[in-house]
Each structure stands twice: as structure tokens, then as C-alpha cells.
Amino acid sequence: MQLKELPLNALQFYATSSYPCSYLPGQQARSQVAAPSHLVNGVIYAELVRQGFRRSGLFTYRPYCDGCCACTPVRVLVAEFQPDRSQRRAWSRHSTLQARVLKPSFVQEHYDLYLRYQNTRHAGGGMDHDSVDQYTQFLLQSRVNSRLIEFRETLADGEPGPLKLVSILDVLDDGLSAVYTFYEPESSGSLGTYGVLWQIAEAKKLGLAYVYLGFWIKDSQKMNYKTRFRPLEFLVSGNWRADYPSMPASQLS
């Protein structure tokens, strides 16, 4: 289904002014935003995700850059997914973590972990000094079917212990959409990988076909991990396909 065919008669789409790209140094970016945001319900949002949109708080957007189409939406095919050796190790290493599915709400412990993660993994990136309001607007505000999953160590008595990982995701009619994940930055053992593996397992349990991983950029080192979750589909020129133009065969299943 193309964007023009969606039941979006009451929506408008506008382009933002340019801003520095977060992924490609020296580049300027723009976004296309769906408005008014309060009309983007769960049904419409799911269709927009299939057309390459993402969500940040109450804003639904997709890249709309001048002369650049590097941001490529990607999704994992849940039923066909097979973890590689390193992913199996990550899953085994963190198999004792206890996951609790919650509605998004502010918890000081989550916010403290978020700041530690930003200051360690993304220092100077602009989010390492987010206020409570900025954190809430970015991750906790939602008008769709969103979930916050917290992962804790298991204590000797079986009770949940220290917080290790938090994921925000949206439940769609055909999959889970990964909004954001942050974790204890000093922990070893690929917690981020474990978080994606948990989402794939959860989608399979729910009978959903996909896990949407957001945007992938071929020339962005920090996004290379996404191509390890195979088979992966790429949204290119409005169509989901199993390969990416000029992508090395070694990076595809």
C-alpha cells in the first residue's frame, strides 16, 4: 500500500528545516512529519511504519533529506531468523535476566540508567544532558500501543535485582517496532544484541511477522550491527526487498 492510498485524509505531511545529521558527519538532514500528531492512531501508525516512518515521542517522521537517501528502514523476518554464533552466546550469557513488560511511565532508576548510557556511549551527542522532560517526551509519551520492558539481574533468591537494560517498543498489527534501547554501559556481553534477540523472540511468541529496527545507513559504523540479524528486509523505493543495491554479499543472508 502506497502512502497516497492510506486513510490519512485528515493528516498533512510537512518538512522540517535542515539540521546536522546525527549519523553522517558534515551532512544536513531534514524530516517529513505527520501532523496533527493526535490523529496518528495505532492503525495509521502501523501503516506509516511500513512506509518507512518512525516515532519519537508524539512525533511520527521519516527522513526527507535533500539529495540523500542513505537512511534505509529495515525489518527482521521473525519466522526465518536464525541467530549466529555470537548472538547465541549473547542470549546464553544473559539468559538469567528477568524481563518485565510495563506501560511507559517515568521511573527514576530508568532515567539514571539512560543518562549513564548516554554519557558513556554517546557523550557529546546532544542527549547526554537530557532533562527529565526531554527524556519523557522522547521515550514515554505515546498515543499508540507502546511497551517499556525492563531487564534485571536475578538474585540468588530468585528475586529481581539490579537494572541492566530498558527497551521501548511499539506493538503493531504485523510486528514490533523498536523505538529505543539503553543499557548498563559498563556491562559486558552484548546487552544491546540481547535486547534485539528478546524482541525477536517476543514477536514470534505473539505471532508477529517482523521486528522493525528503524533506519540502517550503509556508511554508518554504529548501524552495522543491524545487518547481523538475518534475514533482513530493506525498504527501497517504496518496496520491501531482501537485498540492498550495491551491498556486499557478505553482509546479506
Curated annotation (Swiss-Prot):
Single biological process term from Gene Ontology: ubiquitin-dependent protein catabolic process via the N-end rule pathway
Alphabetized UniProt keyword annotations: Acyltransferase, Cytoplasm, Transferase
Known EC number: 2.3.2.29
Pfam short name (any one): ATE_N
Catalytic reactions of this protein: N-terminal L-glutamyl-[protein] + L-leucyl-tRNA(Leu) = N-terminal L-leucyl-L-glutamyl-[protein] + tRNA(Leu) + H(+); N-terminal L-aspartyl-[protein] + L-leucyl-tRNA(Leu) = N-terminal L-leucyl-L-aspartyl-[protein] + tRNA(Leu) + H(+)
One Gene Ontology term, aspect cellular component: cytoplasm
Acyltransferase is among the record's keywords: yes
UniProt enzyme class: transferase
Keyword hit for Transferase: yes
Molecular functions per Gene Ontology: arginyl-tRNA--protein transferase activity; leucyl-tRNA--protein transferase activity
Subcellular location: Cytoplasm
Described purpose of this protein according to its UniProt entry: Functions in the N-end rule pathway of protein degradation where it conjugates Leu from its aminoacyl-tRNA to the N-termini of proteins containing an N-terminal aspartate or glutamate.
Family: Belongs to the R-transferase family. Bpt subfamily.
Name listed for the protein in its UniProt record: Aspartate/glutamate leucyltransferase
Provenance organism: Albidiferax ferrireducens (strain ATCC BAA-621 / DSM 15236 / T118) (Rhodoferax ferrireducens)
Encoding gene, per UniProt annotation: bpt
